[in-house]
Amino acid sequence: GLFGRVNYNYKQKYHASFTIRRDASSKFGKNVRWATFPSYAIGYTFSEEPFMDWARSVLDFGKIRVSYGKSGKQFDQPYISHGLLTVSSPFLGHPTVQPEWSQGLMNDKLTWEETKQFDLGLDLDFFQHEVNITVDYYHRLTDKLLYNITLPGNYSGYQRQWQNAYAIVNSGIEFMVKWDIIRKEKLTWNMSFNIARNWNRLKKSTNGMDFQNFNGVENFNNNLSVIGKALNGIYVYKDKGYYNSESEIPSYYLNGTRVYTYGSNIYQF
């Protein structure tokens, strides 16, 4: 891989940084193993401006940060894009060299899992830097996530294949306060408080399916992920309550005989 970075600082007020990476991995197919990952960041230290003189007795430092970047991740398994062959049984303690069958469908289009992230932050220092406040907002899109999907039908005897099949969005806010209660030469005591809130949702899934279970079993339990909704949501039938007596159950056989059901939910469809 290759790596480069350029930094710029003007009067300790205006800051800019540009970074670019060009990486390759033999884990991927030969036509998709190279990828470029740029990132950009700018900062504005507004506390150095003359118009902030009125607040200098309280505000020591104030800075706004904005950044955007793209990064890549390799999968752990080194050969799933190339396919694996199983050799025949050992002969006199040594495995033979004749391959017998493939352990799965190869996919030479498997490539990097990509993450694109936007960040907006604010840094504030008060009272001779005794109190520090940091606020951050982020929006992160993780695309081309690796998953062993179920193929339609029975393709060449194999029912599943590894693909770059999912995209997930995370966004959130982080807030932190740090307070130096005691700042002496031989004694330092500080406290910090932080709180964060994250929202996530499934951006897309295999074959555009609305419901997808990440455990590999589709639509067979209550734990599902729906496109546009939070991951791993719990979905159940909506009901009106419970029958309290037999007389409330409007169920009959074709011959007119009542069907007796005990303790059943009243479902809405």
Task: Outline where the language-model segments fall.
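Core catalytic ATP-binding domain of two-component histidine kinases
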Residues: 246-249, 253
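Alpha-helix N-cap recognition
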Residues: 245-246, 269
